[in-house]
Curated annotation (Swiss-Prot):
It comes from Streptomyces griseus subsp. griseus (strain JCM 4626 / CBS 651.72 / NBRC 13350 / KCC S-0626 / ISP 5235). Catalyzes the transfer of the phosphoenolpyruvate moiety from enoylpyruvoyl-2-diphospho-5'-guanosine (EPPG) to 7,8-didemethyl-8-hydroxy-5-deazariboflavin (FO) with the formation of dehydro coenzyme F420-0 and GMP. This is Phosphoenolpyruvate transferase. Its cofactor is Mg(2+). Coiled coil: none annotated.
Amino acid sequence: MRIVVLAGGIGGARFLRGLKQAAPDADITVIGNTGDDIHLFGLKVCPDLDTVMYTLGGGINEEQGWGRTDETFQVKEELAAYGVGPGWFGLGDRDFATHIVRTQMLGAGYPLSAVTEALCARWQPGVRLLPMSDDRVETHVAVETDGESKAIHFQEYWVKLRASVEAQAIVPVGAEQAKPAPGVLEAIGSADVIVFPPSNPVVSIGTILAVPGIREAIAEAGVPVVGLSPIVGDAPVRGMADKVLAAVGVESTAAAVARHYGSGLLDGWLVDTVDAGAVEEVEAAGIRCRAVPLMMTDVDATAAMARQALELAEEVRA
């Protein structure tokens, strides 16, 4: 079975670990969000791609869900001693090596997709990890601070400000001009199932869908497209998805997120058992819906979620 998964960072990576357990023989292609990418200290940092790579390769800091295990921060401390920032983004010493290799390869003319493949050769994530595009796309957030309207990088909004100010708009800068990375449209076209994990629907999956050709390819793939709600009990399971949903005029409910994706894209939707009351509303929107436990408390629980998603896909197919 060929499965394509659109993934952001922590939520997508943890779901993928469960999916690999649920479908050990499946051929899994991950289309990773690169809208979170940021240039720091002259280096190209790809937080979502790295989180997937480290998580599936066994190198992730399990407690925080991002960054490397057994990490140290001596380079960061030395930079701070020179008065060089930003200090709010936690790049560890081991992590720096990844970004140095990536930046060197990009500078030598390799596209991001080839660089990602080379990095994965070390980590052996057990999936084919593709960036959504080789072109530069950056998600920016329009905010008002100190009476001044300005656009800031998504990482500054999310990590530095902790989404503490209202997001007035979310803009994937460069997405309109970007092309899907090599292999992305081919993977979608040959998939048996396409899955939207419980990643952020606006700044993770939404950014991937903003690259021209990807949304259309999924809608026309002719195979079941199933998603899992990142909203449980009217609140995000983790992160601050409610803040960015509000910016695009979507309520923080499991049903509202399903409608946001729409029946033209989504065939099936899983909501948590606490949101069982939303099933009827989602089905009224033309999307098959089931209520199942959706808390990724451990790999077994996550694998059970993945199995439910694949079962729902088979129901849709039938």
